[in-house]
């Protein structure tokens, strides 16, 4: 029962539950049973009790007699001595536990709501880490979700026995005392409630619960009207966050903030002191989800290993301003490194993070980012600055000791049709990402940094895009790329379809421009060499405008058993070119001419068709739907001389099964490949009743009726056997899923003319859905048909590709040919211990590209990885890419304290993520 009168509760918010009192024995003459007295509130607010009538009293049952415990006149609980006369040991102090839970309170730590793993429900197991032997489970109790403010909430009280002294205005309760007000509940063996002072004193097995927090102690003082409390010799638990600790005493403020004196903080299990934070003053704020501590030592097995005067840490997954876990590293080109991030929770929809990075060999790098999220957009600004004290590159061209980076990433919509996008990164020098790490989210480390902004309008049947895109070189081993400044595209489909005809159109107007670098490059030793841009010659040096129009008409015909789509496309391209004097003179020397205005018109005719057959079948006792899907594609494109057109954004696609059914073997619009071919492909699938595709096999080949004479600049079809062949290589693709955990993918392209493999790959991947911590990858790749631009010669190369030309000082045969195997594994060998390994080997150059091996230890509250790694490091001191490759090795240690974050070894996470397929999924699903 509860007292609802605000006037009375303000005086003394307490009503002893009569039904409980009537059932329990009372010890002394001062103890009264509620059933034998009529009690009411007097005018002064005190108790007014009178004995019931004799008649009523006769009907009462006899009073029971205490046999073991009673409430004394001074409010203490007395117990009979044991027959052996042994003294009961006094309570153990939390300081004696050395970071563990107090076993003297319960051997199984049930006093901390600890539930062993075998007793958890399926839902609780799903929220429990794989290596945790249990979890903190808050028991269901009345009022636990009550949101009533403490000052407005009535108090409920229960106990086995009670006594009230009217003169002192003190109520004494004994035996399983429970006080509940709002969401807070306090339990103890005995309690003395002082009406005049509105406070309570509790002794023996004190437990205070509120908002997912539990505080356990030997005794406590409680302010009855506000909920403020002090618990001595305290242990605490935050259930949802798996956080626990202890303190000399814990104070609960009126706003539910918990303050600990000489307290500890850890996410380890009650029987573990693997790591703890110990501080003079620790504050835990459930309202914000963060805690603070002063004069803090990080202790491992109760041994101090690190000191900080102040720390700010999360106690759940909410955002809050403050320091994030630091990162410590040593070695490399930067020496000892310390990163101490500070997070600014500016608003629910935007925040910022500052990353001060101290590097012993370079100085202080200040880096920061600002993130925003609005109803129609999201994005991130970032920047970094360093006055570099390292002078290893002081002789190199393009180096600047004032290092900086700026970036902006944005995606947004002005409304449902207008879209905006920005992807912009700029750096001080091309060596920035080779020398310096970045902590910003979304910054991509590539050789060509994107500097792009676009505005898109999406109509009902068309889209229009205004795009401006430039590139910043983050390397000296490549030539300057073309910028698109600006680019306009309009693509769509006409909204009417007479007789089933479909009218499509693609239009583009774009300006290609670049400033080629001239002069010489100076390497680390002060040696001079010609810039790579000087290798670009003739028409390849041109800038220009390009207008491309590509309307088409098709007649799609679809049936349940197949499809047929004849299509006619017409491509018209107009160029307005400009060429510098060097390019003109080189063109004239080779017997060529330059025309600033060039156009090209090419019709394209194709017929795409396919059939669909299926049947129900059974394979090894399993029912499947087996399909057979033949496809026939005919393409005719007449030859058009395009040698007077530069290749602004064009290259040749590598051969694959999907390339059999394209209408242009080139990417971009500067080359339209002449074709007269018939492609045949067949796909076979095995599909389970639930839609799961167990197996897929596809094979195809093209028959050519004419040579392919249109080539990239400087490439002659007469020198290419594949351009004169009557048939294409056989293209095969195969995928088999043993189940949802095992997957095998492969592709294979075999040339019947040369009777050799053009390219191929096979990849085996294993990662169980139920056990994502198990990963096995094995793959093999071979490719000798690449078509690429060679920066060292300024020419397009067909085949595997050498670096340079025979006789050049930096010549490397088959540098770009790929023939590699890649094996990686993460596998539990015993509980909590996993093996980590990768080996990537280049058969072509007979060298290991990367190899590492080590182990991981993972338990409920911390994780450690120790990895020995060898890799080919790439650090540019020369324009010749092979000269910048050098073998390196190191031993890497990563330690993660769960609940605090990584203490050291962030680079381990980086190369594991890059080198082992499935690693990121493993970490995302781990606890």
UniProtKB/Swiss-Prot annotation:
Component of the lipopolysaccharide transport and assembly complex. Interacts with LptE and LptA. It comes from Pseudomonas syringae pv. tomato (strain ATCC BAA-871 / DC3000). This is LPS-assembly protein LptD. Disulfide bonds: none annotated. Belongs to the LptD family. The gene is lptD. The keyword Signal applies. Its main location: membrane. GO terms for cellular component: cell outer membrane; transporter complex. One of its GO terms (biological process) is lipopolysaccharide transport. It is found in: Cell outer membrane.
